[in-house]
Amino acid sequence: MAVAYYCLSLFLLSTWVALLLQPLQGAWGAPLEPMYPGDYATHEQRAQYETQLRRYINTLTRPRYGKRDEDTAGLPGRQLPPCTSLLVGLMPCAAARS
């Protein structure tokens, strides 16, 4: 029993440490917004900030391709006829016709 308690506590402790040591960006994959250098920054600092800001905006707004590009979301490719039942919303159209 003591060994099981020791293993469980070691597992929980290591999980807690792993969660605390995660990088700020890595968990969700979104980049961090660059820090504004201030009103009295040099031209080089402002140029670097603008470059980082442009990269940040391009990363967040880039088009995504693949499965997310489909508009159907798994629905059939044909148009279904409209339901003329009085019970629309209470039962599916197929059940109302039979």
Swiss-Prot record:
The keyword Signal applies. GO terms for molecular function: G protein-coupled receptor binding; neuropeptide hormone activity; neuropeptide Y receptor binding. The modification Tyrosine amide is found at residue 65. No icosapeptide-like peptide is cleaved from the C-terminal. InterPro entries: Pancreatic_hormone-like (IPR001955), Pancreatic_hormone-like_CS (IPR020392). One of its GO terms (cellular component) is extracellular space. The keyword NAD does not apply. GO terms for biological process: feeding behavior; neuropeptide signaling pathway. Residues 1-29 form the signal peptide. SMART domains: PAH. Keywords: Amidation, Cleavage on pair of basic residues, Hormone, Secreted, Signal. Pfam families: Hormone_3. It is found in: Secreted. Belongs to the NPY family. This is Pancreatic polypeptide prohormone. The gene is Ppy.
